[in-house]
Amino acid sequence: MSDQSSEPLDSSLRQAVVPDSAAGRRFDAVLAELFPEFSRSRLSEWIKSGDALLDGETARPRDTLRGGETVQVQVVLETQTHAAPQDIPLNVLYEDDHVLVIDKPAGLVVHPGAGNPDGTLVNALLFRDPNLAAVPRAGVVHRLDKDTSGVMVVARTLQAQTALVEQLSARDVHRQYLAVVVGALVSGGTADAPIDRHPRDRLKMAVRDDGRDAVTHYRLRERFRAHTALECRLETGRTHQIRVHMAHLKSPIVGDPLYGGALKLPKGATDTLVAELRGFKRQALHAETLEFLHPVSGEPIRASAPVPEDLQRLMSALREDSARAAELARR
């Protein structure tokens, strides 16, 4: 807006001067630019509750400014989560005062809920940084399924949370996944199919004409005899998106308990591959890279999470099985 910025008067009161360039504009719009660390909805609530004052007086969101007014905001940061902090180890890939980037292991639930009241990522985050209790969802701005591993970004401040949510909404956050699917695909492509809740099974999502738009781009990373390793890039971020799209394409993700169907063993598979496929009890899906703009500096950040051991073993077994089949075919 200009070089005018808000300044803390104490732990809960912020003040700023409306620049002359804002003359003729609405109070709520200018307030959002003066205090970008807070969401528009939160600022609107504070205007209505009288916690955002214009020259010491209450004002309406639509009131027109003339420039030069003093704005004061009484920050009311109620606790956003009542989850208990728990000392759960986190694999941190990047950290500063505004964001935390982690490599989430498979098996770790993100949010507490029915069946998982604790032992979640949120519990771990609150132990690492108690201030996250005042940030919506303890700073979690996107999620990974329990049994999907890989990179996630967490906002440590309201300003970071607001900026990252805006980037996600604008589809400016780039996410790439490694997926091992059933079937030897011959080419990559794009799955452009809307997704919504399954009409009968409430635990599942499904491709539906009346669903929300969902787009997944995928390309071949490595072909095996009866499976394929794909690099999947999300354009949207629907629940179970890659899992649903791959199942819709008749190439479900290996080990997927919801969408994978019955276990399929390639004819003549090596004993090692049979053991790996039978023992792989989660979807073979890993969030490998995440790219976003730093919510404060605007600098691009690219974080990568290494392929976990279970997926490495699975791909190694698939590779060996394919090599053995090729050798037998040459005889």
UniProtKB/Swiss-Prot annotation:
<dbReference type="InterPro" id="IPR006224">
    <property type="entry name" value="PsdUridine_synth_RluA-like_CS"/>
</dbReference>
<feature type="active site">
    <location>
        <position position="145"/>
    </location>
</feature>
<keyword id="KW-0963">Cytoplasm</keyword>
<dbReference type="InterPro" id="IPR050188">
    <property type="entry name" value="RluA_PseudoU_synthase"/>
</dbReference>
<keyword id="KW-0413">Isomerase</keyword>
<dbReference type="InterPro" id="IPR036986">
    <property type="entry name" value="S4_RNA-bd_sf"/>
</dbReference>
<comment type="similarity">
    <text>Belongs to the pseudouridine synthase RluA family.</text>
</comment>
<feature type="domain" description="S4 RNA-binding">
    <location>
        <begin position="25"/>
        <end position="97"/>
    </location>
</feature>
<dbReference type="GO" id="GO:0000455">
    <property type="term" value="P:enzyme-directed rRNA pseudouridine synthesis"/>
</dbReference>
<dbReference type="GO" id="GO:0160140">
    <property type="term" value="F:23S rRNA pseudouridine(1911/1915/1917) synthase activity"/>
</dbReference>
<keyword id="KW-0694">RNA-binding</keyword>
<dbReference type="InterPro" id="IPR006225">
    <property type="entry name" value="PsdUridine_synth_RluC/D"/>
</dbReference>
<dbReference type="GO" id="GO:0005737">
    <property type="term" value="C:cytoplasm"/>
</dbReference>
<dbReference type="GO" id="GO:0009982">
    <property type="term" value="F:pseudouridine synthase activity"/>
</dbReference>
<dbReference type="GO" id="GO:0003723">
    <property type="term" value="F:RNA binding"/>
</dbReference>
<keyword id="KW-0698">rRNA processing</keyword>
<comment type="function">
    <text>Responsible for synthesis of pseudouridine from uracil at positions 1911, 1915 and 1917 in 23S ribosomal RNA.</text>
</comment>
<protein>
    <recommendedName>
        <fullName>Ribosomal large subunit pseudouridine synthase D</fullName>
        <ecNumber>5.4.99.23</ecNumber>
    </recommendedName>
</protein>
<dbReference type="InterPro" id="IPR006145">
    <property type="entry name" value="PsdUridine_synth_RsuA/RluA"/>
</dbReference>
<dbReference type="Pfam" id="PF00849">
    <property type="entry name" value="PseudoU_synth_2"/>
</dbReference>
<dbReference type="InterPro" id="IPR020103">
    <property type="entry name" value="PsdUridine_synth_cat_dom_sf"/>
</dbReference>
